[in-house]
Design a protein with these regions (language model features):
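All-alpha RGS (Regulator of G-protein Signaling) helical domain and cognate RGS-like helical scaffolds
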Residues: 1-146
């Protein structure tokens, strides 16, 4: 990720945007490898659309600040092979968790409408994660220390 700004708000927004780019890729991979009409493919298509919309909101928000939004990478490496619906669900949970952490960072760094955007995206990530089988947590996007 290349960001020209050293503003913490912009850096958090750019990191969240980079995460959304990766999420769009991951959900395209999940949907492309699943059985047409299956619940996994249907959920993946819904999540794909949601992350594209989130990505587009972040692009507009960053551009409105006069910054160049980070572009998508030419490709992404999946963390493991997508062999079956169990692996697809595991990847989806990982995507939502990682994006949730990035949006929580926006909530922490930003204010006003940008903070509200981060909070909205964080909630959506948490809800999608639960749809994919993740446990509900008291503070989504915040890693609990034990």
């Amino acid at each position: 990720m290349v960001a020209d700004s050293d503003d913490p708000d912009v850096l958090a927004l750019q990191a969240a945007l980079a995460g959304e780019h990766a999420a769009v890729y991951a959900y395209a991979a999940i949907a492309g490898r699943g059985d047409a009409g299956s619940s996994v493919v249907e959920l993946a298509n819904e999540a794909y659309a949601a992350h594209r919309a989130g990505r587009d909101r972040l692009v507009r928000t960053i551009a409105a600040r006069g910054e160049a939004p980070v572009p998508t990478e030419p490709g992404y490496a999946l963390p493991f092979a997508l062999e079956g619906p169990g692996a697809a669900r595991r990847l989806a949970r990982l995507v939502e968790d990682r994006c949730g952490v990035l949006h929580a960072a926006v909530v922490a760094a930003a204010s006003g409408q940008e903070r509200a955007l981060g909070a909205q995206e964080l909630v959506e990530c948490a809800l999608r994660g639960v749809q994919w089988g993740a446990d509900a947590t008291a503070f989504p996007g915040v890693k609990e220390s034990r």
